[in-house]
Design a protein with these regions (language model features):
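Sequence signature of WD/YWTD-type beta-propeller architectures
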Residues: 20-529, 535-543, 547, 552-572
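Intrinsically disordered, low-complexity segments enriched in glycine/proline and serine/threonine
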Residues: 6, 16, 556-558
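N-terminal Sec-pathway targeting helices
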Residues: 1-13
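Terminal signal-anchor or tail-anchor transmembrane helices
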Residues: 11-21
């Protein structure tokens, strides 16, 4: 990237950040003289958690000092300090002593102006249950339109929630657009959605986890190649034993990227949800992808699936599908009037959660999950606890991803009365995942910032959740976090992910730079991958090969374009 582009990008992020801060503060003013903003009252911390930052707000300018007192209710330990400013972090050594000497009882935090009469206080406590595993998440700028244009600004990060160090960068910069990732229950395999090109949005990698994970031709697959038509392969999820992947085929979505202004468009910068789709399961041993009977009904969209920990059932989102034009196969709805009706909320789209037997890929009867269906709301993002007892899901008035009103609910896996989690903050609570020991959920929320933060909440054996804590070390200026997923490995385990797969965009970039030697080298690697191409891909490659001086290869791909399926073909025998 040129120096000019870097300056422009930094300037844009700075302006966006300043505006977001102004708007957020305007909407979150506290009428009292001063009030404690964080930690939340009655928050429950993991025993390994590093020292949090204590923050407070005030509407009266204070040039004086503050007195803070942090003490165990049993009287065994206390920390008293006088300081300037509206933020304080105890030393790690004192915080560790406080946690140990609290004996898992109450910890009081008291705040007052130096010499003042009024005191604000909150109570905290430390759980006996550790988190015990790291979290892999995506870090990116907003709005999405900027992230898509600057893939090098997106990273995959791996965080040890008990570490005092910064998160580990597992993959710096994206070579192509990347989205959902999942792990097998034993933490030995990873599945990662990384596009294979502009037209093939169905690229997917499955790899064993090691210190360095290579994404290359050995572990690449394309849902589009298998289906012989364009598909996203939305919300793909590895089975607990790592043998199967449940995904969405024949999918079609409503997608709208909003312009940078107004501010709300920056914060919630995209509308995206599936309106058509069948569930399908890929068997890694047999190398067969087969639609799941009972969850492949044309009249419904069936997507956003997850497994029960025993691998016997699949829980997924279902809604009445939009009709298709049988003459054209599209993965994005093109009817702009229809899209605008969804954007303006003149039309609704609501999902229910269903559960279906896997039955070795033979499926069965899909049944609605009581408490997560038929409630007049949209229910989505099911996540089953590893002990098989609880189902946490999101609920909003409409749609699916990035909903401002998204709230998390919990219900027994067999269905029942759903209960709203106490961990829900004021704006967007979503993309939750269970710790391997079934005692914590990690999730994303805009409740403390218009940039998305990571939070952690305890859930006990009875499904009762505690007040959450903020994962401060995941915060980076001008970046959001999303897609947090636990890896069933020791908390301090790290790995690196490297992308070593060639697609047309790489060759196109080399040709644009007039680096024809590099372009020819990439073309050789591309052919060695035995790539899947649509007709338009063959035409584009033919033109590039001609520019590269490879006339015979150019003619070969021009001829292939005449006999290869077009990306908008509806069906192909």
């Amino acid at each position: 990237m040129s120096k000019t582009n870097i300056i422009i990008a930094v300037s844009v992020f700075a302006v966006i950040s300043a505006v977001l801060l102004f708007v957020f503060n305007r909407h979150s003013r506290i009428p009292n003289d001063f009030a404690i903003r964080y930690p939340f009252n009655k928050a429950l911390f993991p025993p390994e958690f590093p020292a949090p930052s204590f923050e407070w707000t005030t509407e009266v300018k204070n040039n004086g000092s503050w007195e803070v007192l942090l003490e165990t209710a049993n009287g065994k330990y206390s920390i008293h300090e006088v300081l300037k400013g509206n933020r304080w972090t105890p030393s790690e050594s004192k915080w560790d002593s406080l946690k140990v000497l609290s004996d898992f009882g109450k910890i009081w935090f008291r705040l007052s102006r130096e010499g003042g009469a009024r005191t604000e206080k909150i109570v905290l406590s430390v759980s006996r249950d550790s988190v015990g595993a790291p979290v892999l998440y995506r870090q990116m700028p907003i709005p999405f339109i900027i992230a898509e244009r600057r893939l090098d600004s997106m990273n995959f990060m791996l965080i040890n929630l008990g570490s005092k160090s910064k998160p580990h960068t597992a993959m710096k910069g994206f070579p192509v657009c990347g989205n959902c990732h999942s792990f097998s229950g034993d933490g030995n395999n990873i599945g990662l959605d990384l596009d294979a090109g502009l037209r093939d949005k169905g690229g997917y990698f499955i790899s064993p986890i090691s210190d360095t994970i290579m994404f290359n031709k050995e572990n690449f697959m394309s849902w589009s190649r298998i289906e012989k038509k364009r598909t996203f392969g939305l919300f793909s999820k590895l089975s607990p034993d790592g043998r199967y992947v449940v995904t969405t085929v024949r999918d079609r979505v409503i997608m709208k990227n909003f312009p940078v202004n107004p501010v709300e468009n920056i914060v919630f910068s995209q509308l995206f949800f599936p309106v058509n789709g069948h569930l399908a399961v890929y068997d890694r041993q047999e190398k067969i992808l087969k639609e799941l009977p009972g969850a492949n009904l044309e009249e419904y969209v069936q997507s956003n699936a997850t497994w029960t920990p025993d691998g016997k059932y699949i829980v997924y989102s279902r809604a009445a599908a939009l009709p298709r034009d049988s003459n054209i196969y599209e993965i994005n709805v093109q009817d702009q009037d229809l899209i605008d009706q969804y954007v303006s909320r003149k039309k609704s789209f609501k999902y229910d959660l269903y559960i279906i037997p896997f039955n070795n890929g033979n499926g069965g009867e899909a049944k609605p999950v009581r408490g997560a269906s038929g409630n007049g709301k949209s229910n989505y993002f099911p996540a089953v606890s590893p002990d098989g007892k609880w189902l946490v899901f999101c609920q909003a008035e409409n749609f699916m991803l990035l909903m401002p009103d998204s709230r998390m609910y919990i219900v027994p896996i067999g269905g029942g009365k759903a209960r709203e989690l106490r961990g829900n903050l004021s704006r967007m609570n979503s993309w939750h995942a269970w710790s391997p020991n079934s005692r914590w959920i990690v999730y994303a929320s805009k409740g403390m910032s218009l940039y998305t933060d990571m939070f952690l909440a305890h859930i006990d054996e009875n499904g009762e959740d505690a007040i959450p804590v903020l994962v401060e070390k995941a915060r980076v200026p001008y970046r959001v976090i999303n897609y947090p997923e636990f890896v069933n490995r020791k908390a301090g385990y790290t790995f690196n992910m490297k992308y070593d797969y060639v697609e047309l965009a790489h060759i196109k970039r080399a040709v644009a730079d007039r680096d024809y030697e590099k372009a020819r080298e990439l073309f050789g690697r591309l052919e060695d991958q035995n790539p899947f191409f649509f007709s338009e891909d063959c035409t584009e490659l033919s033109d590039m090969l001609k520019t590269m001086g490879l006339a015979s290869e150019s003619e070969k791909y021009a001829e292939m374009a005449k006999h290869t399926i077009n990306s908008n073909v509806f069906d192909q025998e």
